[in-house]
Regions:
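Conserved N-terminal beta-strand and adjoining loop/helix that marks the start
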Residues: 1-22
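Residue-level signal for short segments within beta-strands and strand-turn junctions
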Residues: 12-14, 26-27, 88-89
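Conserved Nudix-box catalytic region and its N-terminal flanking loop in Nudix hydrolases
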Residues: 18-61
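Nudix hydrolase/Nudix homology domain
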Residues: 29-33, 89, 94-133
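Amphipathic alpha-helical interface surfaces
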Residues: 46, 50, 81, 120-123
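Short arginine-rich
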Residues: 60-63, 122
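Active-site-adjacent beta-strand/loop module that shapes the phosphate/pyrophosphate-binding cleft
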Residues: 62, 70-95, 105-107, 127
Length: 133
């Protein structure tokens, strides 16, 4: 049985005008909106990978939950397990490592969920429920 490769994703959020907003970035080819996500390097903890991806792909820093919000699995192009973390954004950079080929956009929960694949929509809605309760 082939091994499962690990990835980490992060849902960066802020509260603005009493509404939860989530930061999405374009894919590396600019063909859609995603949350920052990437491979967990050898010897790296998934949480640390999530922090790194938020900075590299979106230019965001903040407070990341110690435990993932959840996990989903991807079967295409090799089996992958993706741990999904939540980050309360405290710093937004104007320029970041991948800003030449990625755009960043803040969206309210319903708009962000509509842009994302089904496996991530559940996490976005769960985040909304947690923050508004």
């Amino acid at each position: 049985m082939p091994s499962v490769r690990k990835q980490a994703a992060v849902i960066p959020y802020r509260i603005r005008n009493e509404h939860v907003e989530v930061a999405l970035v374009t894919t590396s080819r600019g063909k859609g909106w995603i949350v920052p996500k990437g491979w967990v390097d050898d010897g790296e903890r998934p949480r640390d990978a999530a922090i790194r991806e938020a900075e590299e792909e979106a230019g965001l820093r903040g407070v990341v939950a110690r435990k993932p919000l959840g996990r989903y699995h991807v079967k295409g192009h090799g089996r992958r397990s993706v741990d999904v973390y939540v980050m309360r954004v405290t710093k937004i950079r104007d320029h970041w490592l991948e800003d030449k080929f990625r755009r960043r956009r803040w969206m309210r929960i319903p708009d962000a969920a509509a842009c994302l694949r089904a496996e991530l929509q559940q996490f976005i809605h769960h985040l909304e429920g947690e923050l508004e309760s």
